[in-house]
Design a protein with these regions (language model features):
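Structural motif
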Residues: 42-47, 127-129, 203
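ATP-dependent small-molecule kinase phosphotransfer cores
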Residues: 2-21, 63-122
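Residue-level preference for the first positions of well-ordered beta-strands
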Residues: 37-41, 123-125
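Glycine-rich phosphate/diphosphate-binding loops that line cofactor/substrate pockets in enzymes
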Residues: 26-38
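Glycine-rich P-loop/Walker A and Walker A-like loops and their local beta1-loop-alpha1 context
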Residues: 17-26, 40-57
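ATP-dependent NMP and nucleoside kinases share a basic, alpha-helical "lid"
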Residues: 116-159
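Conserved small/polar residues in nucleotide/adenosyl-binding loops
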Residues: 236-243
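Small-molecule kinase domains that catalyze NTP-dependent phosphoryl transfer to phosphate-bearing small molecules
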Residues: 2-3, 130-132, 156-219
Length: 247
């Protein structure tokens, strides 16, 4: 076990100039990519630290208008009512949801916001989960987050999408994520996969990493054509001695 690699990685060659680290480099690349165009879309996976990322983007880009995509969805109470059959009364077990993100979108609100964006002058920042439903804009950035990091944030008080369940049992939050929220988020990500211009890794607070969409797609294709494994996850709270699940 002493030779076990706890941090496996695969080196992807040919894209040294397609990777960016830190907000300074990322801001520079976004502005270069935007050029004289005006609509920046930052579509996000669920659980992103909006207070950090959105504030930085507003400060760096100084947009004339900021559109939050959460406004196209039904309110939190209605979302819960719509999800209830899949959530069940069980603490852990739910029913898998096979629908899409559009099932939870208020189409009237979406149409209104789409019209608003279309008629605005100056830089427009469209931000949040499902932002590309409003428009793919002139530059599409996808801000991603791993499920493991989301679960850690649930434990630290992160609520589910459009909810205020900050102090709820993390297992109940996980259930909502696993059986419904992550399912629609994954489908949505796949739908816009080929359209992503820049891919943003937000797993480490205030230490973002970004690569171009071309580098992102080619890297995934390369990895999928060879053996690979993920970083092992350790659940130290399960028993007195550390138990590692090598996923």
């Amino acid at each position: 076990m002493s030779n076990y690699d706890n941090s496996p990685y695969i080196k992807i060659n040919g894209y040294d100039n397609d990777a960016y680290s830190g907000y300074a480099q990322i801001d520079k690349k976004i502005k270069e990519s935007l050029g004289n165009k005006k609509i920046v879309v930052v579509d996000c996976y669920l659980g992103i630290n909006d207070r950090e990322l959105l504030n930085v983007l507003i400060k760096k880009l100084t947009p004339a208008h900021v559109i939050l995509s959460e406004d196209i969805f039904y309110d939190g109470k209605k979302l819960t009512e719509m999800m209830q059959v899949n959530l069940t009364e069980d603490r852990v077990r739910g029913v898998m949801y096979y629908g899409t993100i559009r099932d939870y979108v208020d189409e009237a609100k979406l149409a209104k916001i789409q019209k608003f964006v279309k008629n605005k002058e100056g830089i427009v920042l469209v931000y949040g989960f499902g932002a590309s439903l409003i428009t793919k804009g002139d530059l599409l950035i996808y801000a991603d987050l791993t499920r493991w990091e989301i679960q850690l944030r649930y434990r630290a008080g992160l609520p589910n999408f459009k909810q205020s369940n900050y102090d709820e049992d993390p297992l109940i939050k996980n259930k909502r994520g696993y059986f419904i929220e992550w399912r629609i988020a994954d489908k949505h990500k796949r739908e816009i996969f080929e359209d992503i211009d820049l891919y943003l890794d937000t797993n480490c607070s205030n230490k973002p990493k970004m690569i171009t969409g071309i580098a992102f797609r080619n890297a995934l294709r390369s990895v999928c054509n060879q053996p690979f494994r993920l970083v092992p996850v350790s659940y130290t709270h399960l028993r007195a001695h550390e138990t590692s699940l090598h996923l």
